[in-house]
């Protein structure tokens, strides 16, 4: 073989070997991301547009909004005593829609008049189950508002029902039978109980639209060591994650992490394998503060150091 032919053969061998040795950068990147779990830092008690901006600035990619019904419509409101009013839900939704690149979903924590009794209660709060479908205080109107503003922006919607009697309400019955695109339902408790409620009362909720949460206002209360069979927060969420991996539920969230909960956050992510954590203050609306920033960093920095997680964006669809 002449030197020229040997040179040509050598070049051809290199050209043939290159694509076999080096994978396509684009596909490799997608594959690497696909093997990681999108993780959600959910800002707790976001009741106004300033709180939303602060949460995003601190690193949140999802927000939990406590809501209550009034004759004028739905409002961000936590304790329905007239002292925790925030912005109208319409204004909140519009603000979230503008941040759709950063916010993956909105968790709507539905409050009811049953939470408040006595002379100090806000008598203007209405029971949405007793509102007519066309009334602004109805569940129908709430869903229409979410579908009108959030769904077109690609922001997912999570209806949360927490507390005694919540799943016996007409509001829950309506939502479980009328879920639309981009919507899911969240029930709180140990996974066996949650699945039992879905089976008996929420048959309209498909497994891919089922979400469960478990926790306590102060995360350290009843947290456990993640090795128990159940009951304790970490073990209960670990059991939920196992059910998720079987396809019984779509997402599993824990709550509420605050400043100083870094070790417990790590356990929820690494041992309980949750999809996300509600963080912030225990009983105060969300705002920018060194404590809320620290609580957010506990999640975001842990995820950044992880080999199998990444912080979700608006492009990630949790359900």
From Swiss-Prot:
Q: Which GO terms describe its cellular component?
A: extracellular region
> What's noted about domains in the record?
The SMD-tail motif is highly conserved and may be responsible for structural stabilization.
Write down the EC number: 3.1.4.41
Q: Name it.
A: Sphingomyelinase D
Q: Which InterPro entries match?
A: PLC-like_Pdiesterase_TIM-brl
Annotated residues for binding of Mg(2+): 64, 66, 109
Which species does this protein come from? Answer: Ajellomyces capsulatus (strain G186AR / H82 / ATCC MYA-2454 / RMSCC 2432)
Q: Which residues form a coiled coil?
A: none
What Gene3D superfamilies does the database record attribute to this sequence?
Answer: Phosphatidylinositol (PI) phosphodiesterase
The cellular location(s) given in this protein's UniProt record come to: Secreted
